Amino acid sequence: MSPQTETKASVGFKAGVKEYKLTYYTPDYETKDTDILAAFRVTPQPGVPPEEAG
């Protein structure tokens, strides 16, 4: 019989959905010479917040 191991679900990641606006902005990001700036015009569908439409 093989020994049992204990697995902890909280190690590595937490399950669930994070609000999008909490994850898309990184205020301390430093630009690099290889970064590319792109702009897109997005029109949200009715009922979708503009910041989540992109």
Swiss-Prot record:
Which residues carry the post-translational modification N-acetylproline, per the record?
Answer: 3
Please provide, alphabetically and separated by semicolons, the GO molecular function terms listed in this UniProt record. Answer: monooxygenase activity; ribulose-bisphosphate carboxylase activity
Q: Which residues lie in the propeptide?
A: 1-2
Reaction equation(s) it catalyzes:
2 (2R)-3-phosphoglycerate + 2 H(+) = D-ribulose 1,5-bisphosphate + CO2 + H2O; D-ribulose 1,5-bisphosphate + O2 = 2-phosphoglycolate + (2R)-3-phosphoglycerate + 2 H(+)
Keywords linked to the UniProt accession: Acetylation, Calvin cycle, Carbon dioxide fixation, Chloroplast, Lyase, Methylation, Monooxygenase, Oxidoreductase, Photorespiration, Photosynthesis, Plastid
Q: Does the keyword Glycosyltransferase apply?
A: no
The UniProt entry's GO CC annotations, sorted and at most eight, read: chloroplast
Its annotated compartments are: Plastid, Chloroplast
A Gene Ontology annotation in the biological process aspect, one of them, is: reductive pentose-phosphate cycle
Superkingdom of the source species: Eukaryota
Q: Provide the positions where the record notes the PTM N6,N6,N6-trimethyllysine.
A: 14
Which InterPro entries does this entry report, sorted A to Z?
RuBisCO, RuBisCO_lsu_fd_N, RuBisCO_lsu_N_sf
What Enzyme Commission number(s) appear in the record? 4.1.1.39
Q: What class of enzyme is it?
A: lyase
Assembly behavior: Heterohexadecamer of 8 large chains and 8 small chains.
**Other known facts:** The basic functional RuBisCO is composed of a large chain homodimer in a 'head-to-tail' conformation. In form I RuBisCO this homodimer is arranged in a barrel-like tetramer with the small subunits forming a tetrameric 'cap' on each end of the 'barrel'.
The similarity annotation says: Belongs to the RuBisCO large chain family. Type I subfamily.
Function recorded in the entry: RuBisCO catalyzes two reactions: the carboxylation of D-ribulose 1,5-bisphosphate, the primary event in carbon dioxide fixation, as well as the oxidative fragmentation of the pentose substrate in the photorespiration process. Both reactions occur simultaneously and in competition at the same active site.
Q: Report what the protein is called.
A: Ribulose bisphosphate carboxylase large chain
Query: Top-down, what is the taxonomic lineage of the species of origin?
Result: Eukaryota, Viridiplantae, Streptophyta, Embryophyta, Tracheophyta
Which gene produces this protein? rbcL
